[in-house]
Amino acid sequence: TLCFTTDAGCRRNKINMLETQHGLSPIEEVIADARAGRMFILVDDQSRENEGDLCIIGEHANAQAVNFMAKYGRGLICLALTRAHTEQLGLEMMDRRNESRHQTAFTVSIEAREGVTTGISAADRALTIHTAINPHARQADIATPGHIFPLVARDGGTLVRAGHTEAIVDIARAAGCAPNGVICEIMKDDGTMARLPDLMDFAQQHNLKIGA
């Protein structure tokens, strides 16, 4: 979950408070939807990015899911991976200095080496995702640069960094799936970031669970 402290009990209490105050779904329901292959929304704290991301576990990220993210999320479509898997793929960090405000750990962008055309279509991006998350994937299976943007989740998950990257990996693990996922920030029609009231409306409109 995104909302955390280093003490598990305090973290659970804070999450319960947010769920009660804002009508968010219990994290257990979000995990159940994730396991079933449904998309969901994760929001972070107002003191952090104050944004919501469309999320889906990697194995369920088909062309329809990618198209939904591109059409309705409008943000950057990213693939959250563990450090071990990015090393298996031989992916280098986009910039080792990483001076971004929230230390978002981008690697170089990627494309499936085989089976894609220009790489940007929903089907091509879904193929790239599935190629990259294959447990036997190697550097030879991936070309760079490309149209999917991998993110490296911190070891230790949301107990170490309260980011969407770590949250989707934690949820995938909790759902009994491989620890990866696809995320995309949600923007409004006017190009500004969707905040919690907007995200609640968005979730209701598209029948999605929303968690913290």
Regions found by a protein language model. Give the residues of each.
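Catalytic domains of riboflavin
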Residues: I15-G211
